Each structure stands twice: as structure tokens, then as C-alpha cells.
Amino acid sequence: MNSKYEINTKENREFLKASCENLLNFGHRFPSPNGGSYYLGDDGTPWKDRNRETWITCRMAHVYSLGLMLGHEGSGELVDAALKGLRGELHDDKNGGWYAGVTQEGGIVPNKQCYAHAFVILAASSALTAGRPGAKELLEEAVDVYDQHFWNEEEGLACDTWNTEFTVLDDYRGLNANMHTVEAFLAAGDVTGDKKYHIRAGRIIDHVIRWAEDNSWRIPEHFTKEWVADLDCNRDRPDDPFKPYGATPGHGIEWARLITQWALANCREV
């Protein structure tokens, strides 16, 4: 085996460091003038004819918060640009929370997604860990909105999608948003020291492990509002980007990582 692929060899550490730097260099041109993230082409060129989405902007805030802590040049300014977008064009000043995104002309992409709001918590948590101005206030608002509209304390799970005004809740329930909620709650618990976030993450994980066990260890992705697995969801549209038909192997890998992270943080066996 090539030594650069052998864990913790000198060549492996150098390879990982170089790969990390290449990825961080690639994304430097993501911010639009108002802070929302552009999609990027293969060479890092901004695609200005596409929507600027909240979840991508949050991911960029998270990534460059890590970059800042790794000493990557320019990361602080990029985090601040993404936070500007989350406080500005992506924020719904009238109804609260965050739009799914904005169009290239600045119009609103409708609906309020748990998926996007979980990412706002992650972005703010990471930015706060990295010491960026305004991150604490953003995190406080993000968890307040999330608690009010998405988290169900009785169920120990999060709902999925509201209309833009937060007046009509869709019947669909899904694990993709809950997976990223676990990611966000782990980050929020780490930076605030509030144990309730790790407890909530553990409650979601308990559900997921049980559902996986009941389904031959293939994790169901889609559910009814009563949290009954809907194994036929999108059978006719198997390539839906956010609600694909069937189990998603990559999500199984991500759940394994999140469950391990939660267990290590809480000194638990699973």
C-alpha cells in the first residue's frame, strides 16, 4: 500500500494536510456581495446564475471556521462574509428564521426547512468556536427559532418543512434533516457547554438505531407525520436530490460517524 494512505504515517499526514489546503483554497470565491454562497464550478468559478442557498452558505461558514483554526490564510474574512449572508439576504426579518435561499435576482426561495436551520446552528457554533464577531448572537437566535418551530421534545425528533410564514407544517418527516440536527446539536453542545443538546442528539440517535435494526440495518430515510417509515417514498423519483428513494449508503456512513462522535463525547457504549 502507498504509505500516504496508511493512517498516521508521515506521508499520510502530509497528504491530508495538502488535500485540506487544496479544498480550502478551492472555495475562496464563494461569497456573493451580500454574503450568500454561490455554487462553484470545477475550477472554483462562481456560478452566479444559480440560487444562493442557506445550507451551502452555512457549510462555508463551518468550513472556514475550521480553516481559521487550522491557520488557513483568509479564513476569518470568509467566515464573516457567510455570517453577513445569514444575517442579511438569507434571513427572514418579517417571519423569523431563514429562507431556503434566494434567487440570482434576489427573490425568495419559499419554505422554511429544518435542514437549513440545522445548518445555521452548525455555522454559528463553529464560528463562535473560532471567535468570530456576531456568532454568539446568531447561535442564540438559531436555537430559539429551531426550538420554536422544528424540535419536538415529546417525540425527541425534528419535523421537516414549514411554509415561509411558519403557519403550515408539511406532513413529511425525514431523517436527513435529523441527521444534520445531530451534527448541529453536537457542535452547539460543545461550544455552549449546555448538555441538553447532546441529550437531544442522543435521543435522535436512539430512534435511528432502532429503525435501522428493524430494517435489516438499512436506515429508512422517509416517514409519515406519525413517524411510520414510508419505504415507497419517491419510488417514481429515485434521484430526488434531498429525498431519494430507498436507503442512502452515504448517510449510513455519516450516521456511523455521528454516533461514534456522540458516544465518545458522552462516554457511552452503543
Regions from the PLM with identified roles:
Residues M1-V270:
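Glycan-recognition and catalytic cores of secretory/periplasmic carbohydrate-active enzymes
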